[in-house]
Swiss-Prot record:
It comes from Macaca sylvanus (Barbary macaque). SMART domains: 7TM_GPCR_Srsx. The lineage of its organism: Eukaryota, Metazoa, Chordata, Craniata, Vertebrata. Glycans are attached at N29. Residues 1-37, 94-118, 184-191, 267-279 are extracellular. It is found in: Cell membrane. This is Melanocyte-stimulating hormone receptor. Its main location: membrane. Belongs to the G-protein coupled receptor 1 family. The gene is MC1R.
Length: 317
């Protein structure tokens, strides 16, 4: 990804010296002040990407295999898995090419590396945007299924879901291409930050509303069965904990990356901001961690999908 404060990884590898052993420690910024820099080992970066790649390939394969999973909800989950797969795969490819260039095992002209870097950047950026969009689409789908349960199948149809998916992919590719072309414009970075905040607010509002409705429903049942008041309280706490984990993971994994973009606009030369810029690879690693967690939250909790996945794994042996 083209970001201020850190050179492009592939192009920098052409003339780079062997890097020091990755570490967690204090590094000096431009003003001589000390700041915390977390270096992500390439082996860890590749390992996280591989785990995410395998997980999301399994999700896509299971949904494609089982016709019972060909519904709008699983369509969005499948596309989320595909987006996460591309996020992990593109970052793995960039890391692998960088290591080969640094080791001298791969010879390439600067122009070729520039083009490859641009392609990887577009894939990475578009898959990030689409991943955020599909997280929002899943939240909207679940909201409609709860608040418009009787009309759900007439509102959320498979053709409409497919059109939404196509629109998300096209918009993601176009926006990412513009971002790569005009990454040095503050307006572009601010648009990305606003988009992330919009997705965060959308998910928070929808899931909090769904939790409130579920608690009201449980409270109504508890009134009919007075003995179940403790169970109702436990349900509310469990729902709040689940919501906190879901939104917390989303913010923890995606927030640092968009904070990075925000600081590029607000304080590109400030010493403190420069310290944060040094941890860009850590922020990418957190996004890959989110790609690992997404299948656990949205896919593997489905009994039907787990059963299909088991069949796929048994057949592969």
């Amino acid at each position: 990804m083209p970001v201020q404060g850190s050179q492009r990884r592939l192009l920098g590898s052409l003339n780079s010296t062997p890097t020091a052993t990755p570490h967690l420690g204090l590094a000096a910024n431009q003003t001589g002040a000390r700041c915390l820099e977390v270096s992500v080992p390439d082996g860890l970066f590749l390992s996280l990407g591989l785990v995410s790649l395998v997980e999301n390939v399994l999700v896509v394969t299971a949904i494609a295999k089982n016709r019972n999973l060909h519904s709008p909800m699983y369509c969005f989950i499948c596309c989320l898995a595909l987006s996460d797969l591309l996020v992990s795969g593109s970052n793995m490819l960039e890391t692998a090419v960088t290591l080969l260039l640094e080791a001298g095992a791969l010879a390439a002209r600067a122009a070729v590396v520039q083009q490859l870097d641009n392609v990887i950047d577009v894939i990475t950026c578009s898959s990030m945007l689409s991943s955020l969009c599909f997280l929002g689409a899943i939240a909207v789908d679940r909201y409609i299924s709860i608040f418009y349960a009787l009309r759900y199948h007439s509102i959320v149809t498979l053709p409409r879901a497919r059109r939404a998916v196509a629109a998300i992919w096209v918009a993601s590719v176009l926006c990412s291409t513009l971002f790569i072309a005009y990454y040095d414009h503050a307006a572009v970075l601010l648009c990305l930050v606003v988009f992330f905040l919009a997705m965060l607010v959308l998910m928070a509002v929808l899931y909090v509303h769904m939790l409130a409705r579920a608690c009201q429903h449980a409270q109504g049942i508890a009134r009919l069965h007075k003995r179940q008041r403790l169970a109702h309280q436990g349900f509310g706490l469990k729902g709040a904990a689940t919501l906190t984990i879901l939104l917390g993971i989303f913010f923890l994994c995606w927030g640092p990356f968009f904070l990075h973009l925000t600081l590029i606009v607000l304080c590109p030369q400030h010493p403190t901001c420069s310290c944060i810029f040094k941890n860009f690879n850590l922020f990418l690693a957190l996004i890959i961690c989110n790609a690992i967690i997404d299948p656990l939250i949205y896919a593997f909790r489905s009994q039907e999908l787990r059963r299909t996945l088991k069949e796929v794994l048994l057949c592969s042996w």
